[in-house]
């Protein structure tokens, strides 16, 4: 019996999602433009993505300081800029390489250079993992290390299938958010999972829609709404098996939360 085209990403409520997408998405996307401050050697919007994705993870850096560092070469203490530089490098790599299993691992190697020891960079974890809140509560438990490889194989299958599939721009946003969500719930790396998930979402958008996707300030919006971002993830249940056994949780996450995560980036583009 042949395997289903999609092995891990549910799409049963795609139609319900499409009813909520704001109008004018394609026109707004087409109108995105690079910032005047950008040069061949410096990307303003890649800096925005790197700074705010890092701030979600607790890095203490502001955009103005990072631009001074990245564009004008102003020196800061290494601890202030190293991890953001690493993530910037991963974004630049993604912008010039196809989205596939090998390159996802390479992007993680780049963004995790100052997060984890070299032997764990770009390699799937082999131990239990959970995400905790600042007050010590368990936010959610990631996939068991015994199934991480098989779950990621399913995700890579779905990425490959979706990259070949013709779809409307609204559908692209739907699947991009699902990739982000399922990746972060699997939590395949020892560290750098959130950064990787946000990069993966935008990488998929760019592969399907073109390089203008890199100009969307989705990471900034996720940071500005990070409480809702984590509240939505919390709706999916504490344990990873709850995610895969009750797909209605994903649909609730997508279609009924006060600010569905897969509409945030669409809102960003239209409002910009």
Give residue spans per PLM region.
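FIC/Doc superfamily catalytic core
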Residues: 1-272
């Amino acid at each position: 019996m042949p395997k289903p085209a999609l092995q891990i990403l549910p799409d049963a409520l795609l139609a319900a999602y499409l009813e909520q997408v704001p109008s004018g998405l394609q026109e707004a996307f087409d109108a995105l433009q690079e910032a005047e401050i950008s040069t061949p050697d410096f990307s303003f919007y890649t800096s925005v993505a790197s700074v705010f994705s890092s701030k979600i993870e607790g890095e203490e850096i502001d955009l103005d300081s990072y631009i001074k560092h990245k564009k004008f070469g102003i020196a800061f203490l290494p601890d202030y800029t190293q991890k953001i530089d690493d993530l910037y490098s991963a974004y630049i790599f993604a912008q010039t390489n196809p989205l596939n299993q090998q390159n996802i691992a390479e992007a993680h190697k780049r963004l995790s250079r100052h997060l984890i020891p070299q032997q764990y960079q770009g390699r799937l974890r082999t131990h239990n993992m959970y995400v905790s809140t600042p007050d010590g509560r368990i936010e959610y438990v990631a996939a068991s290390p015994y199934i991480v490889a098989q779950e990621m194989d399913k995700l890579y299958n779905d990425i490959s299938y979706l990259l070949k599939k013709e779809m409307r721009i609204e559908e692209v946003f739907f699947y991009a958010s699902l990739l982000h969500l399922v990746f972060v719930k699997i939590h395949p790396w020892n560290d750098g999972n959130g950064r990787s998930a946000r990069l993966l979402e935008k990488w998929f958008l760019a592969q399907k829609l073109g390089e203008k996707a890199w100009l969307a300030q989705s990471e900034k919006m996720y940071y500005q709404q990070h409480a809702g971002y984590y509240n939505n993830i919390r709706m999916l249940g504490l344990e990873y098996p709850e995610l895969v056994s009750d797909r209605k949780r994903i649909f609730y996450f997508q279609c009924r939360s006060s600010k569905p995560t897969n509409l945030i980036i669409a809102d960003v583009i239209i409002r910009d």
